[in-house]
Amino acid sequence: MARYIGPKCKLSRREGTDLFLKSGVRALESKCNIEAAPGIHGQRRGRQSDYGTQLREKQKVRRIYGVLERQFRGYYQAAASKKGATGENLLQMLECRLDNVVYRMGFGSTRSESRQLVSHKAISVNGKTVNIPSYQVRPGDVVSVREKSLNQLRIVQALELCAQRGRVEWVDVDAAKKSGVFKNVPARSDLSADINENLIVELYSK
């Protein structure tokens, strides 16, 4: 299945919110009008049905984490089979993806760039090279930039950006060594309040 490689701004405009698909050099709002949907009639956002609202929420989360539809459905099915709230389980599984953890630690300026670092074998987990972006990181795992990639300019710049915006509390990073520990799976209260995972559960429960 093909991965979307078009304008990132267009996706954020589609969802009407900043999906953090571009680096933090400049705020997305200064680069594109996220209040207007893409296309020639973008100024008009029609009233959505319940299904449309649920679908948009699913698409928003899928695009934030850079996951294709088939894979996203697989995450949902796995989340539904676990104990606890399905929506919370889903978000936690997405947060534990290696490409997302690399982004959270600040080694990549975006999740897309972080996924590329993983795919290009620039990242190790517990001393072993892992090139699978969907790899599930566990509490206590040590995620590091491999020696061959330590001096990559984009990693240095990403760490500088991360230092400016701040790091999440569930990772502990030594920026000088470009290595960090995934301390724990984040609780729902630690994650974005702008996501309504219950809409996704309602969508897939039909």
Swiss-Prot record:
Listed PROSITE patterns: RIBOSOMAL_S4 (PS00632), S4 (PS50889)
GO cellular component: small ribosomal subunit
GO BP term (any one): ribosomal small subunit biogenesis
Record SMART domains: Ribosomal_S4, S4
Molecular function via GO: rRNA binding; structural constituent of ribosome
Name of a matching Pfam family: Ribosomal_S4
Domain S4 RNA-binding, residue spans: 96-156
Keywords: Ribonucleoprotein, Ribosomal protein, RNA-binding, rRNA-binding
InterPro entries the UniProt entry points to: Ribosomal_uS4, Ribosomal_uS4_bac-type, Ribosomal_uS4_CS, Ribosomal_uS4_N, S4_RNA-bd, S4_RNA-bd_sf
Cystine connections: none
Quaternary context: Part of the 30S ribosomal subunit. Contacts protein S5. The interaction surface between S4 and S5 is involved in control of translational fidelity.
Role, per record: One of the primary rRNA binding proteins, it binds directly to 16S rRNA where it nucleates assembly of the body of the 30S subunit.
Family, as annotated: Belongs to the universal ribosomal protein uS4 family.
Protein's UniProt name: Small ribosomal subunit protein uS4
